[in-house]
Amino acid sequence: MSATWTLSPEPLPPSTGPPVGAGLDAEQRTVFAFVLCLLVVLVLLMVRCVRILLDPYSRMPASSWTDHKEALERGQFDYALV
């Protein structure tokens, strides 16, 4: 009744998981491309926001704050009803 354990020279059976070289199916590729596009848009928006925060007046057109406006356009309503 002695049990002897010996190692067999046979290789182990392959694992039951997905193969290592398996590609993505069509739905996974579509989702991956969509997420990648969203990340690119997010990075572009972050860069734009940082540039605006660092120099806010360079993005503003000069004509909106340097031209001379009439009194009613500036908000001065003194004697407007006369």
From Swiss-Prot:
Function, as annotated: May mediate extracellular or intracellular signaling of cortical neurons during forebrain development.
Family of the protein in this entry: Belongs to the cortexin family.
Cellular component GO terms held in the UniProt record: membrane
Keyword presence, Cell membrane: no
Official protein name in the record: Cortexin-1
Organism the protein comes from: Homo sapiens
Gene: CTXN1
Top-level taxon of origin: Eukaryota
Transmembrane segments: 30-50
Topology relative to the membrane: Single-pass membrane protein
Subcellular location: Membrane
Region (Disordered): 1-21
Keyword Transmembrane helix: yes
Keywords of this entry: Membrane, Transmembrane, Transmembrane helix
